[in-house]
Structures are given as structure tokens and as C-alpha cells.
Amino acid sequence: MSSASSLAPVRALALSPPRPFRHGARRLARAPRAAASADPSPTASKLEGAAAEAYMATLAEDLTHLFDDRGIDRSLYEPTVRFEDPLTKYDDIEGYLFNIAMLRRVFDPTYTMHAIALTGDWEVSTRWTMDMSLPLPWRPSLTFTGTSVMGIDPATMRVATHFDTWDAISTQGFFLETKSPEAVAEVLRQVFDLTVQPDLETPEYVVLRRYAEYEIRRYPDVVVAETKTGGESGVSEGKRLAAGGMTGGGGGGDGSFNPFGALAGYIFGGNAEEKKMEMTTPVFTSDDGKMQFVMGRALGDDPSALPAPNDGERVGLGIRTGGVFAAVRFNGVATDASAAEAERRLSERLARDGHARKPGAPASLAQYNDPLTNPIRRRNDVLVEIEGFDNARLDL
């Protein structure tokens, strides 16, 4: 992962003025109101209209340089800018810039902004994802999502306060002042997640929200080779969420059909061109009775351009449709029971947090490791598609 920042499609909103932010409170986005078009002046009572749009565009562009060689423009910030997040607190621009430099040097971060909005008379908020890595033997990756609430000094049009929130914790503010262990616990939970992702090509996804117990991710469409985990006896007998042929057996009428072996045979030369293709990760199995191997990006995005499978009755080529999915991770040997329990917990959390599962969409299990991997280090994700998710919202 490289030190970089990127700007996802940004939406500028004019929202009604917020209540003052309190330690321990979760910020709520308010209903939109109409914006005026007047430019700010020394007597302006609020930032609005074209001036607000221009200011947010400038700030959004500058934040794309948060972790690159150019860095942010310090002239956009007050010398006495006050910064606070769940782990750190600084009271001037030098501390602010030191924190950015430290993150870049130690964690090799990538920053993606998803939305920027006017959330008060002189307040702008952003929603973002930050991915980091640590140079430790087990190569931990850390992901944080949250909001930045920036107060603007009307006299100078500079950022005077910057307050970061994390979606993964409920008590916001600097932990030494809130006396909450949540932020430290969240960092340690990610650092000491010992599950490992193999050095194989993996479909990229964006984490839109990282909560303490699950993530919401955006996946692209990917080309897949697929088969039924039920073999010739049909889906009903092989309707298994867990690994099918990866753990032996796949539900065929005589127990001999191995869905993993059928797909592996295709990519390792069992096709019309005898073409050998690279193994990727993860292997997807779903509770509608399918197992899928993701085809490498170098093979293109058209399934019809791939060599035909020799076992055309059992192995097919198609598209695994992307979208917004909730995901929960667990380690160990994935079984039908462990995957079903993970799905149950995930569904409960989604209902609690107001996210709706897409009706009729199957749950799926993503398995990243081969059977020789120590079970403690195996990564398994259960995914369920959700609908009606608004990534620009600042309160979820």
C-alpha cells in the first residue's frame, strides 16, 4: 500500500446548523436546506452559496495531498488550529503537521474522501476511509472510517478546529480526556488480527464503514468461473454456505463431485486452450449453491473471451455482480455451522444499526487460505448485500 490520497466522488451539501459537538456524542447529519449564493464578507453571518461550494472544492482538493510529497497547504489552517481525534490531540499547526508526517512515515496510509458537506454556519465536515499497514512480521492492515468536523474562522477563512470521529467507537474525543478505552482497543484489535491474506491477486474493494463488529464494503463486478456445490443432484442437496470441495466432498449424488477440484481443473489447463491461469483469492461459496473462482484482472472483463471449460456441464463462466455488502470476518476452519452463526450475528447487527439486507440476495462465504494454513491464521468473511446505503451520510 502506498502513501497516497484519493478523492472519491464528492457531494457538497448545505445542512442546517449542528448542535455543539460533545465528547462521547455521535454526530448526526441534519436535513438539507436551501443555500444562498452570496459570497462571504467581513459581515457575513454564515458560509453559504457559491462561496461555500468554492471553499469546499478547495479543501477537498487539498486533502488529496494529505499523505503525498506535496502535503496539505498550511495556509488553509490557523497557526493555532486545534486538532483532536480518539488517539491524539494538538493545539497548533506544528503539532497538526507532525501528526500527519508521523502517520505517513510509520503507517504508510491511503486516504479516500467520500463526501464533503456544509454542516453549520462556519463548519465543514468530510467522510473518509483511511487504510494503513504496519511493518510487522504478520503484516497487519488497519482500516478506519469516520468523519472530520472542521470549524472555520470567519475572519480568516482558515480551519480553526478539526475534530475526527471513528465509526468503530461510540465515545468520541481524545481517550485520555474521555477515559474511554475504545480507541486503543480498536487499534490493538486490528494490529493483533493474525489472519493472513495470501500473496495472490484479490478483487479490490473499498471499506465504506468500519464498525467494531463488521464492515460495509463496495465491491466491483468481477469475472468468475463457477460451479454448483450440489453437483448433478442439484442445488437443494448441496446448498451449503461453507467450503464445499475445499474441505472434501461437494454433495454430488455419489459424493464424488468436488466443486473446488472442478474449478481448479479449469484454471490449471482444463479448458479448450489448455491455458493455465493464476490462482486468485478468495474462493466464494454462497447459500444459493454456487462456488466461484475470481478470474485475474489480466484476463479482461468479458467472460465470453475466456477459454471454454472442458467440463462445460459443470463449470461455467460469468460475472459476480458487485455492490455494497456488509462483511464480518472470522478465523478458523470454516464450516456450515460457523458460517451460519457469523451470518446470524451480522444480520442482527445490521438490523440494530438500521441497514437493510437486499431481499432475496444470497449470503456468501469468502475463504482466503489453503487448507494447509494454520486455522488461527485463516481469513473467512461472510458477506450479505445491503440496499439503500447512502455513503455520503455523516451519521452512519
PLM-predicted stretches and their roles:
Residues 1-25:
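N-terminal chloroplast transit peptides
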Residues 1-8, 28, 32-42:
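N-terminal mitochondrial targeting presequences
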Residues 18-27, 32, 131-195:
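A beta-strand edge to alpha-helix "cap/lid" segment located at domain peripheries
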Residues 46-68:
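Short, aromatic-enriched amphipathic alpha-helices that serve as compact interaction elements
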Residues 57, 61, 70-127:
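A solvent-exposed, acidic/Ser-Thr-rich amphipathic alpha-helical stretch
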Residues 111-117, 145-152, 315:
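Hydrophobic/aromatic beta-strand elements that line small-molecule binding cavities or substrate pockets
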Residues 116-123, 151-159, 319-322, 351-357:
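A short, structured loop/turn motif at beta-sheet edges
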Residues 186-396:
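A solvent-exposed interaction/effector surface
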